[in-house]
Amino acid sequence: MPGTALSPLLLLLLLSWASRNEAAPDQDEIDCLPGLAKQPSFRQYSGYLRASDSKHFHYWFVESQNDPKNSPVVLWLNGGPGCSSLDGLLTEHGPFLIQPDGVTLEYNPYAWNLIANVLYIESPAGVGFSYSDDKMYVTNDTEVAENNYEALKDFFRLFPEYKDNKLFLTGESYAGIYIPTLAVLVMQDPSMNLQGLAVGNGLASYEQNDNSLVYFAYYHGLLGNRLWTSLQTHCCAQNKCNFYDNKDPECVNNLLEVSRIVGKSGLNIYNLYAPCAGGVPGRHRYEDTLVVQDFGNIFTRLPLKRRFPEALMRSGDKVRLDPPCTNTTAPSNYLNNPYVRKALHIPESLPRWDMCNFLVNLQYRRLYQSMNSQYLKLLSSQKYQILLYNGDVDMACNFMGDEWFVDSLNQKMEVQRRPWLVDYGESGEQVAGFVKECSHITFLTIKGAGHMVPTDKPRAAFTMFSRFLNKEPY
Protein backbone atom coordinates (compact mmCIF):
# COMPACT_ATOMS: atom_id res chain seq x y z
CA MET A 1 0.00 0.00 0.00
CA PRO A 2 1.44 3.48 -0.89
CA GLY A 3 3.13 5.19 2.02
CA THR A 4 3.51 1.99 4.05
CA ALA A 5 6.86 1.77 5.86
CA LEU A 6 9.16 -1.12 4.98
CA SER A 7 9.48 -3.78 7.63
CA PRO A 8 12.86 -3.87 9.41
CA LEU A 9 13.59 -7.35 7.97
CA LEU A 10 12.83 -6.29 4.38
CA LEU A 11 14.90 -3.13 4.84
CA LEU A 12 17.83 -5.20 6.10
CA LEU A 13 17.58 -7.56 3.13
CA LEU A 14 17.48 -4.65 0.67
CA LEU A 15 20.48 -2.98 2.30
CA SER A 16 22.51 -6.19 2.24
CA TRP A 17 21.60 -6.74 -1.42
CA ALA A 18 22.63 -3.19 -2.29
CA SER A 19 25.95 -3.48 -0.45
CA ARG A 20 26.79 -6.67 -2.31
CA ASN A 21 26.22 -4.88 -5.59
CA GLU A 22 28.41 -1.95 -4.60
CA ALA A 23 31.41 -3.85 -3.32
CA ALA A 24 33.71 -6.76 -4.05
CA PRO A 25 32.09 -10.21 -4.40
CA ASP A 26 32.31 -12.02 -1.06
CA GLN A 27 32.20 -15.45 -2.70
CA ASP A 28 35.44 -14.71 -4.59
CA GLU A 29 37.49 -13.52 -1.61
CA ILE A 30 40.47 -15.75 -0.79
CA ASP A 31 40.13 -16.51 2.91
CA CYS A 32 43.24 -18.60 3.47
CA LEU A 33 45.90 -19.14 0.81
CA PRO A 34 48.04 -22.27 1.29
CA GLY A 35 51.82 -21.83 1.36
CA LEU A 36 51.99 -18.58 3.31
CA ALA A 37 53.45 -18.50 6.82
CA LYS A 38 51.19 -15.51 7.50
CA GLN A 39 48.05 -14.48 5.61
CA PRO A 40 48.27 -11.03 3.95
CA SER A 41 46.91 -7.80 5.39
CA PHE A 42 45.50 -6.83 1.97
CA ARG A 43 42.41 -8.45 0.45
CA GLN A 44 42.60 -10.71 -2.58
CA TYR A 45 40.03 -12.38 -4.78
CA SER A 46 39.92 -15.26 -7.26
CA GLY A 47 37.02 -16.23 -9.47
CA TYR A 48 35.63 -15.86 -12.97
CA LEU A 49 34.84 -13.00 -15.31
CA ARG A 50 32.39 -13.29 -18.19
CA ALA A 51 34.39 -12.86 -21.41
CA SER A 52 31.52 -13.91 -23.71
CA ASP A 53 28.32 -15.94 -23.51
CA SER A 54 30.38 -19.14 -23.31
CA LYS A 55 33.84 -18.03 -22.12
CA HIS A 56 34.88 -17.67 -18.51
CA PHE A 57 38.24 -16.03 -17.73
CA HIS A 58 39.85 -16.80 -14.40
CA TYR A 59 41.07 -13.76 -12.51
CA TRP A 60 43.17 -13.21 -9.40
CA PHE A 61 42.90 -9.70 -7.99
CA VAL A 62 45.23 -8.39 -5.28
CA GLU A 63 44.32 -5.12 -3.64
CA SER A 64 46.99 -2.50 -3.05
CA GLN A 65 48.96 -2.79 0.18
CA ASN A 66 48.81 0.99 0.47
CA ASP A 67 45.48 2.85 0.19
CA PRO A 68 43.59 0.59 -2.25
CA LYS A 69 40.71 3.06 -2.50
CA ASN A 70 42.94 5.64 -4.20
CA SER A 71 45.51 3.37 -5.87
CA PRO A 72 45.26 2.74 -9.61
CA VAL A 73 43.93 -0.51 -11.05
CA VAL A 74 46.57 -2.27 -13.15
CA LEU A 75 45.64 -5.13 -15.49
CA TRP A 76 48.44 -7.62 -16.17
CA LEU A 77 48.48 -10.11 -19.06
CA ASN A 78 51.19 -12.61 -19.93
CA GLY A 79 51.57 -13.68 -23.54
CA GLY A 80 52.42 -16.82 -25.46
CA PRO A 81 49.93 -16.76 -27.05
CA GLY A 82 48.51 -19.39 -24.73
CA CYS A 83 50.36 -18.73 -21.45
CA SER A 84 48.99 -17.94 -18.01
CA SER A 85 49.15 -14.55 -16.31
CA LEU A 86 49.61 -16.39 -13.01
CA ASP A 87 53.21 -16.72 -14.17
CA GLY A 88 53.44 -12.95 -13.70
CA LEU A 89 51.85 -13.20 -10.25
CA LEU A 90 53.83 -16.14 -8.87
CA THR A 91 57.25 -15.65 -10.50
CA GLU A 92 57.55 -11.96 -11.45
CA HIS A 93 55.84 -9.15 -9.53
CA GLY A 94 53.03 -10.63 -7.45
CA PRO A 95 52.76 -10.04 -3.69
CA PHE A 96 54.26 -13.47 -3.04
CA LEU A 97 56.53 -15.67 -5.15
CA ILE A 98 56.49 -19.45 -5.46
CA GLN A 99 59.56 -21.19 -4.04
CA PRO A 100 61.37 -24.14 -5.69
CA ASP A 101 59.57 -26.66 -3.45
CA GLY A 102 56.28 -25.86 -5.22
CA VAL A 103 54.58 -25.51 -1.83
CA THR A 104 55.87 -22.37 -0.13
CA LEU A 105 55.09 -18.74 -0.97
CA GLU A 106 57.43 -15.96 0.18
CA TYR A 107 56.44 -12.29 0.27
CA ASN A 108 57.95 -10.20 -2.51
CA PRO A 109 59.61 -6.94 -1.31
CA TYR A 110 59.20 -5.53 -4.84
CA ALA A 111 55.55 -6.52 -5.39
CA TRP A 112 53.70 -4.24 -7.76
CA ASN A 113 50.66 -4.28 -5.47
CA LEU A 114 52.67 -2.24 -2.95
CA ILE A 115 51.40 0.76 -4.93
CA ALA A 116 48.58 -0.57 -7.15
CA ASN A 117 45.54 -2.83 -7.22
CA VAL A 118 46.70 -5.52 -9.65
CA LEU A 119 44.33 -7.68 -11.71
CA TYR A 120 45.77 -10.84 -13.27
CA ILE A 121 43.55 -12.43 -15.96
CA GLU A 122 44.24 -15.79 -17.62
CA SER A 123 43.47 -15.22 -21.29
CA PRO A 124 42.33 -16.52 -23.76
CA ALA A 125 39.91 -19.33 -22.84
CA GLY A 126 41.75 -22.63 -22.43
CA VAL A 127 44.71 -20.97 -20.70
CA GLY A 128 45.30 -21.89 -17.07
CA PHE A 129 41.98 -22.10 -15.24
CA SER A 130 40.03 -20.17 -17.92
CA TYR A 131 37.56 -22.20 -19.94
CA SER A 132 34.81 -22.20 -22.53
CA ASP A 133 31.52 -24.05 -22.12
CA ASP A 134 31.83 -25.53 -25.63
CA LYS A 135 35.53 -26.41 -25.14
CA MET A 136 36.30 -24.66 -28.44
CA TYR A 137 39.65 -22.93 -28.11
CA VAL A 138 40.31 -21.67 -31.63
CA THR A 139 40.66 -17.89 -31.40
CA ASN A 140 42.41 -14.85 -32.90
CA ASP A 141 43.79 -11.41 -32.01
CA THR A 142 40.51 -9.53 -32.54
CA GLU A 143 38.36 -12.00 -30.60
CA VAL A 144 40.83 -12.05 -27.70
CA ALA A 145 40.78 -8.24 -27.52
CA GLU A 146 36.97 -8.31 -27.40
CA ASN A 147 36.96 -11.09 -24.77
CA ASN A 148 39.51 -9.22 -22.63
CA TYR A 149 37.41 -6.07 -22.89
CA GLU A 150 34.24 -7.92 -21.83
CA ALA A 151 36.13 -9.50 -18.93
CA LEU A 152 37.40 -6.08 -17.84
CA LYS A 153 33.85 -4.68 -17.98
CA ASP A 154 32.69 -7.61 -15.85
CA PHE A 155 35.46 -6.90 -13.35
CA PHE A 156 34.18 -3.36 -12.82
CA ARG A 157 30.65 -4.74 -12.50
CA LEU A 158 31.86 -7.03 -9.71
CA PHE A 159 34.09 -4.35 -8.16
CA PRO A 160 32.19 -1.07 -8.77
CA GLU A 161 34.16 0.64 -6.02
CA TYR A 162 37.14 0.71 -8.43
CA LYS A 163 35.41 1.96 -11.59
CA ASP A 164 36.60 5.55 -11.12
CA ASN A 165 40.20 4.67 -10.22
CA LYS A 166 42.94 5.29 -12.74
CA LEU A 167 43.31 2.27 -15.05
CA PHE A 168 46.56 1.05 -16.61
CA LEU A 169 46.85 -1.88 -19.03
CA THR A 170 50.13 -3.80 -18.80
CA GLY A 171 51.63 -7.05 -19.99
CA GLU A 172 54.56 -8.91 -21.47
CA SER A 173 55.65 -10.74 -24.62
CA TYR A 174 52.62 -11.55 -26.84
CA ALA A 175 50.75 -9.04 -24.68
CA GLY A 176 52.54 -6.70 -27.08
CA ILE A 177 49.53 -7.59 -29.25
CA TYR A 178 46.94 -8.12 -26.49
CA ILE A 179 47.44 -4.78 -24.72
CA PRO A 180 47.27 -2.22 -27.58
CA THR A 181 44.35 -4.05 -29.26
CA LEU A 182 42.51 -4.02 -25.92
CA ALA A 183 43.45 -0.38 -25.27
CA VAL A 184 41.86 0.71 -28.56
CA LEU A 185 38.55 -0.75 -27.32
CA VAL A 186 38.89 0.64 -23.79
CA MET A 187 39.70 4.16 -25.03
CA GLN A 188 36.21 4.26 -26.59
CA ASP A 189 34.53 3.43 -23.27
CA PRO A 190 34.09 6.56 -21.12
CA SER A 191 33.13 4.41 -18.11
CA MET A 192 36.76 3.30 -17.79
CA ASN A 193 39.38 5.77 -16.56
CA LEU A 194 42.19 4.66 -18.87
CA GLN A 195 45.45 6.50 -18.17
CA GLY A 196 48.07 4.50 -20.01
CA LEU A 197 49.67 1.22 -20.97
CA ALA A 198 53.02 -0.48 -20.45
CA VAL A 199 54.39 -3.48 -22.34
CA GLY A 200 57.51 -5.40 -21.37
CA ASN A 201 59.57 -7.17 -24.04
CA GLY A 202 56.52 -7.06 -26.26
CA LEU A 203 55.96 -8.31 -29.77
CA ALA A 204 55.03 -5.08 -31.58
CA SER A 205 56.18 -5.93 -35.12
CA TYR A 206 57.16 -9.35 -36.47
CA GLU A 207 59.26 -7.72 -39.20
CA GLN A 208 61.26 -5.49 -36.87
CA ASN A 209 61.63 -8.30 -34.33
CA ASP A 210 63.10 -10.67 -36.94
CA ASN A 211 65.28 -8.08 -38.65
CA SER A 212 66.78 -6.86 -35.38
CA LEU A 213 67.29 -10.35 -33.94
CA VAL A 214 69.88 -11.23 -36.59
CA TYR A 215 71.92 -8.13 -35.71
CA PHE A 216 71.48 -8.85 -31.99
CA ALA A 217 72.73 -12.42 -32.48
CA TYR A 218 75.77 -11.40 -34.52
CA TYR A 219 76.89 -8.58 -32.23
CA HIS A 220 76.48 -10.81 -29.18
CA GLY A 221 78.89 -13.31 -30.68
CA LEU A 222 76.38 -16.01 -31.61
CA LEU A 223 76.97 -16.08 -35.38
CA GLY A 224 80.31 -16.80 -37.03
CA ASN A 225 81.80 -14.57 -39.70
CA ARG A 226 81.09 -17.08 -42.48
CA LEU A 227 77.36 -17.14 -41.66
CA TRP A 228 77.26 -13.35 -41.20
CA THR A 229 78.96 -12.75 -44.56
CA SER A 230 76.52 -15.13 -46.26
CA LEU A 231 73.57 -13.36 -44.62
CA GLN A 232 74.91 -10.01 -45.89
CA THR A 233 75.37 -11.43 -49.38
CA HIS A 234 72.02 -13.20 -49.79
CA CYS A 235 69.60 -11.27 -47.55
CA CYS A 236 70.73 -7.68 -48.12
CA ALA A 237 70.69 -5.24 -51.02
CA GLN A 238 71.41 -1.52 -51.28
CA ASN A 239 72.38 -1.27 -47.59
CA LYS A 240 69.07 -2.78 -46.45
CA CYS A 241 68.60 -6.30 -45.11
CA ASN A 242 65.41 -8.35 -45.16
CA PHE A 243 65.61 -11.14 -42.59
CA TYR A 244 61.82 -11.30 -42.32
CA ASP A 245 60.24 -12.66 -45.51
CA ASN A 246 63.17 -12.98 -47.90
CA LYS A 247 62.58 -15.49 -50.71
CA ASP A 248 66.24 -16.00 -51.69
CA PRO A 249 66.92 -19.74 -51.10
CA GLU A 250 70.40 -19.14 -49.64
CA CYS A 251 69.04 -16.42 -47.37
CA VAL A 252 66.31 -18.79 -46.17
CA ASN A 253 68.91 -21.48 -45.40
CA ASN A 254 71.01 -18.96 -43.48
CA LEU A 255 67.99 -17.79 -41.47
CA LEU A 256 67.09 -21.38 -40.61
CA GLU A 257 70.60 -21.68 -39.16
CA VAL A 258 70.18 -18.43 -37.19
CA SER A 259 66.85 -19.72 -35.90
CA ARG A 260 68.49 -22.99 -34.81
CA ILE A 261 71.32 -21.19 -32.99
CA VAL A 262 69.02 -18.75 -31.19
CA GLY A 263 66.21 -21.14 -30.33
CA LYS A 264 67.43 -24.72 -30.46
CA SER A 265 71.15 -24.87 -29.63
CA GLY A 266 70.90 -24.73 -25.85
CA LEU A 267 71.00 -20.95 -25.41
CA ASN A 268 68.35 -19.43 -23.17
CA ILE A 269 66.27 -17.39 -25.63
CA TYR A 270 64.72 -15.46 -22.73
CA ASN A 271 68.04 -14.46 -21.18
CA LEU A 272 71.22 -14.95 -23.19
CA TYR A 273 73.42 -14.94 -20.08
CA ALA A 274 71.29 -17.22 -17.90
CA PRO A 275 71.56 -21.03 -17.86
CA CYS A 276 68.94 -23.09 -19.65
CA ALA A 277 66.82 -24.90 -17.06
CA GLY A 278 66.81 -28.60 -17.87
CA GLY A 279 69.73 -28.35 -20.27
CA VAL A 280 69.59 -28.13 -24.06
CA PRO A 281 65.96 -27.65 -25.18
CA GLY A 282 64.44 -29.98 -27.69
CA ARG A 283 62.12 -32.95 -27.58
CA HIS A 284 61.68 -33.68 -23.89
CA ARG A 285 59.25 -36.31 -22.71
CA TYR A 286 57.74 -36.35 -19.23
CA GLU A 287 55.31 -39.07 -18.15
CA ASP A 288 54.40 -39.97 -21.75
CA THR A 289 53.99 -36.29 -22.62
CA LEU A 290 56.08 -34.62 -25.31
CA VAL A 291 57.15 -31.08 -24.41
CA VAL A 292 57.35 -28.41 -27.14
CA GLN A 293 59.26 -25.19 -26.43
CA ASP A 294 58.60 -23.02 -29.49
CA PHE A 295 55.83 -20.39 -29.37
CA GLY A 296 56.12 -19.63 -33.08
CA ASN A 297 56.87 -15.91 -32.70
CA ILE A 298 60.25 -15.55 -34.46
CA PHE A 299 61.03 -16.15 -38.13
CA THR A 300 57.39 -17.06 -38.74
CA ARG A 301 57.78 -16.72 -42.52
CA LEU A 302 60.37 -19.48 -42.77
CA PRO A 303 59.21 -22.79 -44.30
CA LEU A 304 58.79 -25.81 -41.99
CA LYS A 305 58.36 -23.59 -38.90
CA ARG A 306 54.89 -24.86 -37.96
CA ARG A 307 54.85 -28.30 -39.57
CA PHE A 308 56.45 -30.13 -36.64
CA PRO A 309 53.87 -29.08 -34.00
CA GLU A 310 51.01 -29.68 -36.45
CA ALA A 311 52.34 -33.19 -37.11
CA LEU A 312 52.55 -33.74 -33.36
CA MET A 313 48.89 -32.85 -32.94
CA ARG A 314 47.90 -35.32 -35.65
CA SER A 315 50.06 -38.04 -34.09
CA GLY A 316 47.79 -38.32 -31.05
CA ASP A 317 50.69 -37.90 -28.61
CA LYS A 318 50.09 -35.96 -25.43
CA VAL A 319 51.84 -32.64 -26.01
CA ARG A 320 52.72 -29.92 -23.53
CA LEU A 321 53.92 -26.40 -24.34
CA ASP A 322 56.52 -24.99 -21.97
CA PRO A 323 58.43 -21.69 -22.11
CA PRO A 324 61.94 -22.58 -23.31
CA CYS A 325 64.69 -22.96 -20.70
CA THR A 326 62.14 -22.38 -17.92
CA ASN A 327 61.33 -24.76 -15.08
CA THR A 328 57.55 -24.65 -14.61
CA THR A 329 57.41 -27.45 -12.03
CA ALA A 330 57.03 -25.26 -8.92
CA PRO A 331 54.08 -23.11 -10.10
CA SER A 332 52.43 -26.18 -11.67
CA ASN A 333 52.72 -28.19 -8.47
CA TYR A 334 51.37 -25.30 -6.42
CA LEU A 335 48.38 -24.50 -8.63
CA ASN A 336 47.43 -28.17 -9.02
CA ASN A 337 47.38 -28.70 -5.26
CA PRO A 338 43.69 -29.44 -4.48
CA TYR A 339 43.78 -27.18 -1.41
CA VAL A 340 45.10 -24.28 -3.51
CA ARG A 341 42.48 -24.86 -6.20
CA LYS A 342 39.78 -24.85 -3.53
CA ALA A 343 41.14 -21.62 -2.02
CA LEU A 344 41.04 -20.04 -5.49
CA HIS A 345 37.45 -21.25 -6.10
CA ILE A 346 38.40 -23.36 -9.13
CA PRO A 347 35.71 -25.86 -10.24
CA GLU A 348 36.74 -29.48 -9.63
CA SER A 349 35.67 -30.37 -13.17
CA LEU A 350 38.48 -28.33 -14.76
CA PRO A 351 41.64 -30.12 -15.95
CA ARG A 352 45.10 -29.59 -14.46
CA TRP A 353 46.71 -26.17 -14.68
CA ASP A 354 49.62 -25.80 -17.11
CA MET A 355 51.77 -22.73 -17.63
CA CYS A 356 50.95 -22.72 -21.35
CA ASN A 357 48.37 -24.46 -23.54
CA PHE A 358 49.72 -26.16 -26.67
CA LEU A 359 46.38 -26.30 -28.51
CA VAL A 360 45.54 -22.65 -27.82
CA ASN A 361 48.95 -21.63 -29.16
CA LEU A 362 48.88 -23.91 -32.21
CA GLN A 363 45.35 -22.97 -33.29
CA TYR A 364 45.76 -19.25 -32.56
CA ARG A 365 45.22 -17.02 -35.62
CA ARG A 366 47.60 -14.07 -35.73
CA LEU A 367 45.78 -11.28 -37.54
CA TYR A 368 48.30 -8.47 -37.07
CA GLN A 369 51.89 -8.25 -38.24
CA SER A 370 52.39 -4.86 -36.58
CA MET A 371 50.79 -2.73 -33.87
CA ASN A 372 51.61 0.50 -35.73
CA SER A 373 48.01 1.60 -36.36
CA GLN A 374 46.88 0.78 -32.80
CA TYR A 375 49.65 2.85 -31.22
CA LEU A 376 49.11 5.75 -33.62
CA LYS A 377 45.41 5.75 -32.71
CA LEU A 378 46.24 5.81 -28.99
CA LEU A 379 48.89 8.51 -29.45
CA SER A 380 46.62 10.69 -31.58
CA SER A 381 44.33 11.23 -28.58
CA GLN A 382 47.26 12.73 -26.60
CA LYS A 383 45.61 11.41 -23.43
CA TYR A 384 47.62 8.34 -22.52
CA GLN A 385 51.13 7.65 -21.30
CA ILE A 386 52.69 4.68 -23.05
CA LEU A 387 55.79 2.78 -21.94
CA LEU A 388 57.59 0.09 -23.92
CA TYR A 389 60.32 -1.45 -21.79
CA ASN A 390 62.79 -4.23 -22.59
CA GLY A 391 65.27 -6.35 -20.74
CA ASP A 392 68.32 -5.99 -22.99
CA VAL A 393 69.50 -9.64 -23.02
CA ASP A 394 66.21 -11.15 -24.24
CA MET A 395 66.21 -12.71 -27.70
CA ALA A 396 62.51 -13.67 -27.93
CA CYS A 397 61.44 -10.01 -28.21
CA ASN A 398 64.71 -8.12 -28.31
CA PHE A 399 65.19 -4.50 -27.25
CA MET A 400 66.44 -3.32 -30.64
CA GLY A 401 63.30 -4.38 -32.50
CA ASP A 402 61.06 -2.59 -30.03
CA GLU A 403 63.23 0.53 -30.17
CA TRP A 404 63.01 0.47 -33.96
CA PHE A 405 59.24 0.12 -33.63
CA VAL A 406 58.97 3.18 -31.36
CA ASP A 407 61.19 5.14 -33.77
CA SER A 408 58.90 4.14 -36.67
CA LEU A 409 55.95 5.89 -34.98
CA ASN A 410 57.73 9.22 -35.69
CA GLN A 411 56.69 10.95 -32.48
CA LYS A 412 58.30 14.18 -31.33
CA MET A 413 61.45 13.52 -29.29
CA GLU A 414 61.28 15.19 -25.87
CA VAL A 415 64.20 13.62 -23.97
CA GLN A 416 67.17 12.20 -25.88
CA ARG A 417 68.38 8.69 -25.05
CA ARG A 418 70.14 8.74 -21.69
CA PRO A 419 70.95 6.40 -18.78
CA TRP A 420 68.34 6.03 -16.04
CA LEU A 421 69.33 5.28 -12.45
CA VAL A 422 68.14 3.13 -9.56
CA ASP A 423 69.20 3.60 -5.94
CA TYR A 424 70.69 0.34 -4.64
CA GLY A 425 71.23 1.56 -1.08
CA GLU A 426 74.78 0.79 0.05
CA SER A 427 75.89 0.38 -3.58
CA GLY A 428 74.58 3.85 -4.37
CA GLU A 429 72.86 4.85 -7.58
CA GLN A 430 73.54 2.55 -10.51
CA VAL A 431 72.77 2.73 -14.23
CA ALA A 432 69.68 0.55 -14.64
CA GLY A 433 69.43 0.93 -18.41
CA PHE A 434 68.66 3.58 -21.00
CA VAL A 435 65.57 5.63 -21.73
CA LYS A 436 64.32 7.97 -24.42
CA GLU A 437 61.08 9.87 -24.21
CA CYS A 438 58.88 11.01 -27.07
CA SER A 439 55.58 12.82 -26.82
CA HIS A 440 53.33 10.42 -24.82
CA ILE A 441 55.49 7.34 -25.49
CA THR A 442 58.69 6.21 -23.76
CA PHE A 443 61.16 3.47 -24.67
CA LEU A 444 63.26 2.10 -21.81
CA THR A 445 65.79 -0.72 -21.39
CA ILE A 446 66.67 -2.64 -18.24
CA LYS A 447 70.35 -3.54 -18.24
CA GLY A 448 71.06 -7.24 -17.70
CA ALA A 449 67.41 -8.32 -17.65
CA GLY A 450 65.88 -10.88 -19.95
CA HIS A 451 62.32 -11.47 -21.13
CA MET A 452 60.84 -11.52 -17.61
CA VAL A 453 62.20 -8.19 -16.32
CA PRO A 454 60.69 -8.27 -12.79
CA THR A 455 62.15 -11.76 -12.22
CA ASP A 456 65.66 -10.76 -13.29
CA LYS A 457 65.82 -7.18 -11.97
CA PRO A 458 63.02 -6.77 -9.40
CA ARG A 459 64.21 -3.48 -7.87
CA ALA A 460 64.76 -1.80 -11.23
CA ALA A 461 61.39 -3.11 -12.46
CA PHE A 462 59.56 -1.79 -9.39
CA THR A 463 61.32 1.60 -9.64
CA MET A 464 60.33 1.86 -13.32
CA PHE A 465 56.74 0.81 -12.53
CA SER A 466 56.43 3.39 -9.74
CA ARG A 467 57.75 6.21 -11.94
CA PHE A 468 55.42 5.15 -14.75
CA LEU A 469 52.30 5.15 -12.54
CA ASN A 470 53.20 8.44 -10.88
CA LYS A 471 54.24 10.19 -14.11
CA GLU A 472 57.68 10.88 -12.64
CA PRO A 473 60.82 11.31 -14.79
CA TYR A 474 62.64 8.02 -15.31
From Swiss-Prot:
Glycans are attached at residues 140, 327. Residues 1-23 form the signal peptide. The active site is at 173, 394, 451. It catalyses: Release of a C-terminal amino acid with broad specificity. PROSITE patterns: CARBOXYPEPT_SER_HIS, CARBOXYPEPT_SER_SER. Keywords: Carboxypeptidase, Disulfide bond, Glycoprotein, Hydrolase, Lysosome, Protease, Signal, Zymogen. The keyword Isomerase does not apply. The keyword Oxidoreductase does not apply. InterPro entries: AB_hydrolase_fold, Peptidase_S10, Ser_caboxypep_his_AS, Ser_caboxypep_ser_AS. It is found in: Lysosome. GO terms for molecular function: serine-type carboxypeptidase activity. Its EC number is 3.4.16.5. Its main location: other. GO terms for biological process: negative regulation of chaperone-mediated autophagy; proteolysis; regulation of protein stability. Protective protein appears to be essential for both the activity of beta-galactosidase and neuraminidase, it associates with these enzymes and exerts a protective function necessary for their stability and activity. This protein is also a carboxypeptidase and can deamidate tachykinins. Belongs to the peptidase S10 family. Heterodimer of a 32 kDa chain and a 20 kDa chain; disulfide-linked. This is Lysosomal protective protein. The gene is Ctsa.
